[in-house]
UniProtKB/Swiss-Prot annotation:
<keyword id="KW-0728">SH3 domain</keyword>
<feature type="domain" description="SH3">
    <location>
        <begin position="352"/>
        <end position="415"/>
    </location>
</feature>
<dbReference type="GO" id="GO:0006511">
    <property type="term" value="P:ubiquitin-dependent protein catabolic process"/>
</dbReference>
<dbReference type="GO" id="GO:0005829">
    <property type="term" value="C:cytosol"/>
</dbReference>
<dbReference type="GO" id="GO:0005768">
    <property type="term" value="C:endosome"/>
</dbReference>
<dbReference type="GO" id="GO:0005737">
    <property type="term" value="C:cytoplasm"/>
</dbReference>
<feature type="modified residue" description="Phosphothreonine">
    <location>
        <position position="231"/>
    </location>
</feature>
<comment type="subunit">
    <text>Interacts with ubp4.</text>
</comment>
<keyword id="KW-0833">Ubl conjugation pathway</keyword>
<dbReference type="InterPro" id="IPR001452">
    <property type="entry name" value="SH3_domain"/>
</dbReference>
<feature type="modified residue" description="Phosphoserine">
    <location>
        <position position="221"/>
    </location>
</feature>
<dbReference type="GO" id="GO:0030414">
    <property type="term" value="F:peptidase inhibitor activity"/>
</dbReference>
<feature type="modified residue" description="Phosphoserine">
    <location>
        <position position="226"/>
    </location>
</feature>
<protein>
    <recommendedName>
        <fullName>Ubp4-interactor sfp47</fullName>
    </recommendedName>
</protein>
<dbReference type="InterPro" id="IPR036028">
    <property type="entry name" value="SH3-like_dom_sf"/>
</dbReference>
<keyword id="KW-0597">Phosphoprotein</keyword>
<feature type="modified residue" description="Phosphoserine">
    <location>
        <position position="235"/>
    </location>
</feature>
Length: 415
């Protein structure tokens, strides 16, 4: 037996209608949070796309519009949680505890207040149609289990279905979202730079999603920033010696201008060629002192052999290759001077040239990784480091080696 009198349960609103109302509010809160999360994800995906200059302002404006819609969905979820769901929680728990077919007058009044708070937020025009709880209001509450728009009853002056309560105010937010996404779909810049956007296989545009924001399949993952290791190469510009010992690696190849003889046995440990500086490896270039690879000297065993062994052992033969077609370094530098005089955008090795600069002051290298500068030297920039030390080489009046130089000693040239 509950403590409520029979007069308290004289209303015609069922307990099932009260539970249906709470379930509808919970679904609405869940949808608001889902929409907000999808809008935030879409904004993040748009910002992650590598944009060209004409699209920067457009994407920035679109992202602002999307985040405004995201903010409205979050505000709606907080409002429904505080003023609609939490307001009814005590009454719903109490009615379910006593398991009565109808609810008390106090619960009915709380239900009407909760519905009024919901309608005030979703569509204020319905507020003028609400009256003091009456028979028509009870019919409205009992109709909450209907999921489709109900037909207009002649006996009800102001019919309000669950469908109209849930979707009455979504048009305003969806229109704002559609305008933001239409900027991307209708922009001529998008058509020019991203033609695949208009040729989507599914044929669905973003502005057609009236309530549920679908993921954009044209968004590509950000370009990986991890450096790629390049195969060490040798260049006559970077090398100071033309004598190389044949590396004992199967399938190894040397530059075409060198013709080496066949391998010969030797007790000498072969020198390792110095790898060229990797332009794309930003992590190695962030340090002022670049690693200097020094050739290892040959180590021979201690002299403990017998006299007979020494007499029979042949003298060691050094595997020094002979150049059948020697390369004239002067001709090579002359060709490089002519090449850089045309101001190309890439080096002969295929690396990009970011700028041409002129030395304003003379600089004497203090580390092996640095290069000397003379006043009015012309250099090409192969890498700009954040610490102010740039990587490049002098190309006029002579061609030098690749190394680091201070960026405050130069001025950029325009060609």
């Amino acid at each position: 037996m509950n403590s409520f009198s029979s007069n308290e349960y004289s209303t015609e609103i069922s307990t099932e209608a009260l539970n249906n109302w709470q379930q509808l509010v919970e679904q609405r809160i869940s949808l608001e949070l889902e929409y907000a999360a999808k809008l935030a994800k879409l904004t993040k995906s748009i910002k992650a796309i590598k944009q060209c200059a004409p699209l920067n302002d457009l994407t920035k404006q679109v992202c602002v519009e999307l985040m405004q819609c995201n903010k409205k969905h979050l505000e709606a979820s907080r409002y429904f949680q505080t003023h609609v769901k939490e307001f009814m929680k005590e009454y719903v728990d109490r009615e379910n505890k006593f398991s009565n077919e109808t609810i008390s007058k106090s619960s009915a009044a709380a239900l009407m207040t909760s519905m009024e708070n919901f309608i005030l937020f979703t569509n204020p025009v319905y507020h003028n149609k609400l009256q003091v709880p009456s028979k028509s209001d009870m019919e409205i509450a009992n109709s909450l289990k209907i999921t489709q728009p109900a037909e207009k009853n002649s006996g009800t002056a102001n019919p309000i279905s669950a469908y109209s309560l849930e979707h009455a105010e979504l048009d305003e937010r969806n229109n704002q979202l559609s305008e933001a996404l239409s900027m991307l779909r209708l922009s001529p810049f998008v058509n020019n730079y991203y033609p695949s956007y208009q040729n989507r296989k599914d044929g669905k545009s973003l502005m057609e999603n009236r309530g549920v924001v679908l993921s954009v399949d044209t968004v590509t993952s950000p370009i990986s920033q991890s450096p790629k290791k390049l195969t060490p190469t040798t260049s006559p510009i970077n090398s100071t010696s033309l004598s190389f010992v044949d590396a004992k690696k199967p399938g190894s190849k040397w530059p075409s201008q060198y013709d080496f003889p066949k391998k010969t046995k030797s007790t000498e440990i072969p020198f390792k060629t110095l790898p060229s500086l990797n332009i794309n490896n930003e992590r190695e270039l962030t340090k002022h002192k670049l690693p200097i690879v020094k050739p290892k000297l040959a180590v021979f065993p201690s002299n403990q052999a017998t006299a007979s062994t020494l007499q029979l052992a042949p003298p060691p033969v050094q595997a020094i290759p002979t150049l059948r077609n020697p390369v004239n370094l002067d001709d090579k530098k002359e060709s490089l001077l002519k090449y850089y005089a045309t101001h190309p955008t890439i080096t002969p090795d295929g690396f990009p040239i970011f700028a041409y600069v002129r030395a304003l002051y003379a600089y004497k290298a203090t580390l092996p990784s640095e290069i000397d500068l003379n006043v009015d030297d012309t250099l090409v920039v192969l890498n700009r480091q954040k610490d102010g030390w740039w990587k490049g080489l002098v190309v006029s009046p002579t061609v030098g080696r690749i190394g680091l130089f201070p960026s405050n000693y130069i001025e950029e040239l325009e060609y």
